[in-house]
Swiss-Prot record:
Pfam families named among the record's database cross-references: Myb_DNA-bind_6
Tissues expressing the protein: Expressed in ovary septum.
InterPro entries: Homeodomain-like_sf (IPR009057), Myb_dom (IPR017930), MYB_TF (IPR050560), SANT/Myb (IPR001005), SANT_dom (IPR017884)
Location in the cell: Nucleus
Annotated spans, Disordered: 193-230
Keyword Nucleotide-binding on entry: no
Domain of life: Eukaryota
Protein's UniProt name: Transcription factor MYB64
Main location, first listed in the record: nucleus
Protein encoded by which gene: MYB64
Length: 423
């Protein structure tokens, strides 16, 4: 009985009987499949969020404006099974920056100034995050600006001297309104003090212009000598005045130049419009008409010495040649006399257009000042082959008669030997 109990205990608590090769192979395949399934389940398991809150303070990455950063509500990600052991992995993501809730944005008190001076003496002028931690209600940026603009021991708070204003003017001509760069060139003057001095001088100058005194020059001089403004340097004030005057002059020049340009363009447009209208009215329709008009107006027989029997030839760019042969006196009636071949200029106030030059005499009537010439050929045997220039009979300047169509046709058929250009 005892031996059976011992064997049962050995079977229950002892090693299992040895396995055959087939059983070992099958058991190995099952174990590998089970391990692979467990790993997949552990990876696909959803993230388990816990209610545990972890606060982490990182002193190396401090926010200068909002103080040290606090990280809260970090959740634990689910467990991953690795080789039968469970390990916890915490989230390494950083939460959003949370500013201080109790930051004071008002003026600094004397107690805060004393504390800030002590902390700067202890930690130096660069560790503003550490100083802001020990100074409640103030951020690192506030401490830095308060120190550099107000509490620094080498700051000058007295009135500006002529030398300082001269340096300010020279720097402003080169740099402009870059007050931080100018503060580096003027020792003892901060950025705020330079900007405030500039704006105060500008306001003072504008107020003097608006409120002029109505007293005499002597009384004004006495008051100015007693006033503190008499001791104030005027270098910066004169410089600002020159800048404003230059700006005004530039604006006036721009206005005048723009006005002149407008006037000149308007005059130019008017001139062009007049030229265009005159060219439309005076532009002839044919070059031959202009050529004939110039000959009949500008050249008379007396000027070209036709009475002496010289032969004159006129030519033009259009190819017309006119020959004036030696005239023979007393060929016709004595009414012509020495006026044979004389050409009369066109009247100034003719109502015909430029295209009616050839028919101007017919349209305006025959007068002593008519410009049209009648070309006739004599069928007489004595003067065969000779072309003579004849004028119409002279009438009084006040008389004008109308010519009907028959007279026009009969006058044109008489000069059959003379050809006219086709228009």
């Amino acid at each position: 009985m005892e031996e059976q109990k011992i064997q049962e205990k050995s079977l229950a608590h002892g090693a299992a009987p040895p396995l055959t090769a087939v059983e070992r192979f099958l058991n190995g395949q099952k174990n590998e499949a089970l391990c692979f399934k467990k790993q997949e389940r552990s990876i696909d398991r959803p993230i388990v969020k816990t209610t545990r809150a972890i606060e982490i303070r990182n002193e190396n990455k401090e926010n200068m404006m909002f103080g040290p950063r606090k990280e809260k509500n970090l959740a634990v990600i689910g467990e991953i099974v690795v080789k039968g052991a469970a390990k916890d992995y915490t989230c390494k993501d950083i939460t959003k920056k949370q500013p201080y809730k109790n930051i004071i944005k008002g003026q600094w008190t004397a107690d805060e100034d004393r504390k800030l001076i002590k902390l700067v003496m202890q930690h130096g002028e660069r560790k503003w995050a550490v100083i802001s931690e020990k100074l409640e209600g103030r951020a690192g940026k506030q401490c830095r600006e308060r120190w550099h603009n107000h509490l620094r021991p080498d700051i000058k708070k007295d009135s500006w001297s002529e030398e300082e204003e001269r340096l300010l003017v020279e720097a402003h001509t080169r740099i402009g309104n870059k007050w931080a760069e100018i503060a580096k060139l003027i020792q003892g003057r901060t950025e705020n003090s330079i900007k405030n001095h500039w704006n105060a001088t500008k306001r003072r100058q504008n107020s003097k212009r608006k409120h002029k005194r109505s007293k005499n020059a002597d009384s004004n001089s006495d008051i100015d000598d007693l006033s503190p403004s008499a001791k104030r340097p005027r270098i910066l004030e004169d410089y600002i005045k020159n800048i404003e005057n230059n700006d005004k002059n530039n604006g006036e020049n721009i206005m005048t130049t723009s006005g002149n340009n407008v006037l000149s363009t308007s005059n130019y447009d008017q001139f062009n419009s007049e030229d265009s209208t005159s060219s439309l009215l005076d532009d002839p329709y044919d070059e031959e008409l202009v050529f004939l008009k110039n000959i009949f107006e500008n050249h008379s027989l007396e000027n070209i010495n036709l009475s002496q029997g010289t032969e004159i030839t006129q030519s033009s760019s259009s190819g017309f040649m006119i020959e004036n042969p030696k005239p023979k006196p007393n060929l016709y009636n004595n009414t012509f006399g020495t006026h044979l071949g004389a050409m009369v200029t066109e009247p100034a106030n003719s109502s015909h257009l430029a295209s009616d030059i050839y028919l101007s005499d017919l349209l305006n009537g025959t007068a002593s000042s008519s410009s049209s010439l009648t070309f006739l050929s004599s069928n007489n045997n004595e003067h065969a082959g000779e072309n003579e220039l004849l004028l119409p009979q002279a009438n009084s300047t006040s008389e004008r008669r109308e010519m009907d169509l028959i007279e026009m046709l009969s006058g044109s058929t008489q000069g059959s030997n003379i050809w006219f250009p086709l228009f």
